[in-house]
Swiss-Prot record:
This is Neutral ceramidase 1. It comes from the Eukaryota. Mostly expressed in stems, leaves, roots and siliques, and, to a lower extent, in flowers. Belongs to the neutral ceramidase family. Pfam families: Ceramidase_alk, Ceramidse_alk_C. One of its GO terms (molecular function) is N-acylsphingosine amidohydrolase activity.
Length: 779
């Protein structure tokens, strides 16, 4: 009998193990569920022009793109009831969403899908990196430093968003969504604590920290494929990269996305799903999968000596080399894992967690005004990798990645219930807002046409402004009032409406050559079961965000809707569907630090948002329609651009595009983890071809069996930097400097650096080229 049982066990165990493993994979790590929805995810390159274009965020005229730290992407999820409504959420590695970009994306989606995707159920949010190309918003004040509208920046975003949504639509399949949240303590500090302290002490006492520490994560699990992605929301600014950086970068949130996606693809390829999903190591990347030949150092050097630098040569248009690198880890029948690190109420939250210090003395900046000796220009926040901004970006990104990974592995609360949405356009330049009074009565106040205060020009500790502006300035000074009046003098009604903000730029009343600031804003609620996403077109401060979430959550709980009897989750998607700068509390506004001075519509802006979102939430749970509101203007045909086009590219006589100017030394051998390779190539302006879904540079490793070169790192890797520069300011000659900081995870072997580009001839035709360095050894 015992022998029969043993035989039965030996026969059945392999099948039992196989079935158990399959069930584990299907349910996303041991979480058994019944799929509620159709889910689909997508991702597409939105990097844009990597040269000549001013970066969006710091408003620093001198911060002009000249290369790539790593690429930018649009990441999308679609959730649909099998026979019902659907919602779309797009997260952009961009400073913010743009009203005109969304309008044009919706036009394209309607042409392709009819009324399936509209401005009502599509939400688009930006991570707020300050290291992406600017010029893609339609209002004057946001495109002054980019020399007007930049068509390439705009097109890259519209194309990328559309393609990421198309991917997500085509990937729609039955699946489940799980939610988890937890505290991340060391990735953000309050950069305006004096303003936060002006909030009522009773309100502040309800919260342990002066910034939100909670990360909320969604885990998407396909019924057949298992986990296919994750999206999370956490508040910290995209300002780990400084105002002097000129390399396009997704900053800390973009880095976190890259870490999470590479981790998943690598670990599902290398090891069994169950044993590896508890790891929180930074991914080792593709190179770790290549066969590791244990050749002697001498043999590797001898092999490398056969491969000298390749002169530049013309090629057909570059195929998608970047996708070749990462696709090495993917299954042909399954799309890549998509992980987005989304922005929420980050208005007063800085990733420069060491605090703000004076450059000249090393002492902490003035608490109330963030100045050094009365001036703001010397006060800078320090990230955890100070003075290395790239290291700070990596560290803050890594901290978010590790938190997300922990939440991902433990996510067990399944989203269940309706998919729905509400959207409205609201004119915030003249909104009547009803406020409760202490005596139980109410009063009606108004928001104001947009205006920016003097402290706006002071900047923040993440990026100080110029001249003699200071934060906390509620008076202004005569000289800058005179300068202001040349543009537009605010009338008494506007001054009184914005009080105590001294108006520097009366943007809401400036209309030449077209509108300087928005008046009509997009407000949106997306519902997935017990999760409600509030899409707001601005940067809410910590306490402003808390008040909005609390008001909406209270409205939902008190609705009497039986579907909402359990736990309700409310998250704010910041910088979404447009941009209108900051939103502070009424009390923070009185202090007039940078955030208060940048609250466009006056002291009652937040109250206006709360009022309108309560209306939207009520209509959502009661299944009532809402009026669409006034349509925002389409100013695309009015845009002006003063960015000089690329006229032509040239090389010195006898040289070719792609030639190596500065090669690696002969017999170069470097150790992993502490070596760096630098190669300089004859190049051409990256604006000639953005190489979307491609790469300007590769690190390639020699496959010794067949003597072929395999791509292992590209310009979407943080260890590889592509830097472009002209010979002189207006020169038609240029060069590309490629720097590879060899990671500890790189496999020993023979390597080379390859550069791709596109050159423009005098009469407009563009031809592509490539060139490669000599080989070198990594041990």
């Amino acid at each position: 009998m015992e022998l029969s049982l043993v035989r039965l066990w030996n026969t059945c165990f392999p099948s039992f193990f196989y079935i158990s493993t399959v069930l584990f994979l299907l349910t996303g790590g041991g979480v058994y569920s019944h799929s509620e929805y159709l889910i689909g995810l997508g991702s597409y390159d939105i990097t844009g022009p990597a040269a000549d274009v001013n970066m969006m965020g710091y408003a620093n005229m001198e911060q002009v793109a000249s290369g790539i730290h790593f690429r930018l992407r649009a990441r999308t999820f679609i959730v649909s009831e099998p026979q019902g409504k659907r919602v779309v959420f797009v997260n952009l590695d961009a400073c913010m969403a743009s009203q005109i970009v969304k309008l044009k994306v919706i036009e394209r989606l309607k042409a392709r899908y009819g009324d399936l995707y509209t401005e009502q159920n599509v939400g688009i949010s930006g991570i707020h990196t300050h290291a992406g190309p600017g010029g893609y918003l339609q209002y004057v004040v946001y495109i002054v430093t980019s020399l007007g509208f930049v068509r390439q920046s705009f097109d890259a975003l519209v194309d990328g968003i559309e393609n990421s949504i198309i991917q997500a639509h085509e990937n729609l399949r039955p699946g489940s969504i799980f939610l988890n949240n937890g505290e991340l303590l060391d990735a953000g500090v309050n950069r305006s604590p004096s303003a936060y302290l002006n909030n009522p002490s009773k309100e502040r006492s309800k919260h342990k920290y002066n910034v939100d520490k909670e990360m909320t994560l969604l885990k998407f699990v396909d019924d057949q494929w298992g986990p296919v992605g994750s999206f999370n929301w956490f508040a910290t600014h995209g300002t780990s990269m400084s105002r002097t950086n000129s390399l396009i970068s997704g900053d800390n949130k973009g880095a976190a996305s890259r870490f999470m996606e590479d981790w998943y693809e690598q670990n599902t390829a290398e090891r069994s799903y169950s044993e590896e999903f508890i790891s929180d190591e930074i991914p080792r990347r593709v190179s770790s999968l290549i066969e590791n030949h244990q050749d002697s150092h001498h043999e590797l050097l001898e092999l490398a000596s056969y491969f000298e630098s390749q002169p530049g040569k013309p090629v057909t248009r570059i195929s998608s080399s970047a996708r070749r690198v990462r696709s090495a880890l993917r299954k042909a029948d399954k799309p890549g894992f998509v992980s987005a690190f989304c922005q929420t109420n980050c208005g007063d939250v800085s990733p420069n967690v060491l605090g703000a210090f004076c450059l000249d003395t090393g002492l902490p900046c003035d608490f109330n005004h963030s100045t050094c000796g009365g001036k703001n220009e010397m006060c800078y926040g320090r990230g955890p990798g100070y003075p290395d901004e790239f290291e700070s970006t990596r560290i803050i990104g890594e901290r978010q990645f590790k938190m997300a990974l922990e939440l991902f592995n433990k996510a067990s609360e399944q989203l269940q219930g309706k998919v729905d949405y509400r959207h409205v356009y609201v004119d915030f330049s003249q909104l009547n807002v009803t406020l409760p009074k202490k005596d139980g009565k109410s009063e009606v106040v108004k928001t104001c046409p947009a205006a920016m205060g003097f402290a706006f020009a002071a900047g923040t500790t993440d990026g100080p402004g110029a001249f003699d502006f200071t934060q906390g300035d509620d008076k202004g000074n005569p000289f800058w009032r005179l300068v202001r009046n040349v543009l537009k003098t605010p009338d008494k009604k506007q001054i009184d409406c914005h009080y105590p903000k001294p108006i520097l730029l009366d943007t809401g009343e400036m209309t030449k050559p077209y509108d300087w600031a928005p008046s009509i804003l997009s407000l949106q609620v997306l519902r997935i079961g017990q999760l409600f996403i509030l899409s707001v077109p601005g940067e809410f401060t910590t306490m402003a965000g808390r008040r909005l979430r609390y008001a909406v959550k209270t409205q939902l709980k008190n609705s009497g809707n039986k579907d909402l009897s359990g736990e309700i989750h409310v998250v704010i998607a910041g910088l979404a569907n447009g941009y209108s700068q900051y939103v502070t509390t009424f009390e923070e506004y009185q202090v007039q630090r940078y955030e208060g001075a940048s609250t466009l519509y006056g002291p009652h802006t937040l109250s206006g948002y709360i009022q309108e979102f309560k209306k939207l939430s009520k209509s959502l749970v009661l299944d009532m329609p809402v009026q669409p509101g006034p349509q925002p203007p389409d100013l695309l045909d009015k845009q002006l651009s003063f960015l000089t086009p690329v006229m032509m590219d040239t090389t010195p006589s006898g040289d070719s595009f792609g030639d190596v100017i500065s090669d690696v030394p002969k017999n170069l051998s470097l150790k992993r983890g502490n070596g760096q390779v630098t190669v300089v190539f004859r190049s051409a302006c990256p604006r000639n071809d953005l190489l979307t879904e491609g790469t300007f540079t590769l690190v390639e490793r020699l496959e010794q069996k067949d003597k072929t070169w395999t791509p292992v790192y590209d310009d979407d890797d943080l260890c590889l930097r592509f830097k472009w520069s002209r010979h002189k300011k207006l020169s038609s000659r240029s060069q590309a400097t490629v720097e590879w900081r060899i990671p500890e995870s790189a496999s020993p072997g023979v390597y080379r650096i390859t550069h791709f580009g596109a050159a423009k001839k005098l009469f407009g035709s563009v031809h592509h080229f490539t060139g490669s360095s000599s080989a070198f050894v990594v041990t």
